[in-house]
């Protein structure tokens, strides 16, 4: 419990003036050998109305002198006990340390406040549970090189400890200690210094790492694969966008190659690519362009690579198309199209492979990006026998109305060259026909046109089936048959002609067509090649 005197001492900031020495002593505000002691603000004290010190500095001085009363007062004024311990160590006042030892807690917390190596080591000794390794580790953390030098022989006897201290110094970025360990002791592995340098982008630490590495290579029979290590460092630096690190590595024999610049491309460090692009062979630049497409590099990087090749990429067109499709990276296609000179159109090549190998979604996305017409895609799909694509693209472009779909697909058939492609589109048309409600009188006109379309394209089975369906309507079937016979004769379609002949006979026996109409139809040039009129003569005899 505080006495009244202690409460006054704690809270008095301005002393009545003047007060004699005896009164100050009675108040406990007199420091022997220094004079009156007065608190100023929260953090400072005034000695003899003249000298100003921080409370903690005054506390250290009082503890060094062993002045317990002043120490007690300054602690009352919220001084830091750690400074009292430091002062006590400086003055070898172990009685004072013993008095406050229970309040100290962890002595390691005091170490950052100590500048003197001897006091640092004495403070560490206060903790009975610690060993030499603990001291050395804290010496590294707080940059106490002289302590390490003092225990050099002991460290040298423990190789594992040397490595531990070196790695700790790297993580703490204590360059002086790192250099001393590197030159004075034997280190098995130097990788930590480079790892930390990369992690913190610390060039000075990286340079120091190479200083120690070259020292190790030149003075020890070290089993170091230097070219491989340099290449690894270049790749790591390129991936991190650390150009200065790369230049430092090159000083020691590093070589910038495809793998290094690929790392820069992957992590979008265009400036590094720009710095070295003219130092690598043209063949390497082409490979980098292919990788940039694969990595979906941004526009500026692709333009940089293309311009370094003067946009002459014809020799790698197939590989470009392959990467564009496999990695959904179409930007390079757009850039090549934007050129006024040396323009290269890869749209058809990419679209052809998409239609052959990719999904409907990918194809539609590409169509949207490059304004590709559905007719173009459907023709490609027909050539590749991708019926599903024909149906899906058609419905997406023209809706789900049968007549609209058939109209557009018929037009495509007329302009399609490969017969296999025509057949597939005709198959699609017939599939739409079979799955629609066209067998009604209102659709008679459209069925009539579709039948003639089949006849024109020699679609025998489709023609035969639609004739059977059209006959059910009992509409202009005779007209259809006669017109289709003319088409068959003109285009030399014997199977269509035979189907027509069968229906003409049927119509004749039913009385739906006259002999004169038949003879007129069969009077066409070369008609006798396809039909035999003997059946008509036999019918007359009967």
From Swiss-Prot:
Pfam families: DUF249 (PF03158). Induction: Expressed in the early phase of the viral replicative cycle. It comes from the Viruses. The keyword tRNA processing does not apply. The keyword Glycoprotein does not apply. InterPro entries: MGF_505. Keywords: Early protein. Transmembrane segments: none annotated. Belongs to the asfivirus MGF 505 family. Plays a role in virus cell tropism, and may be required for efficient virus replication in macrophages. This is Protein MGF 505-10R. It comes from African swine fever virus (strain Badajoz 1971 Vero-adapted).
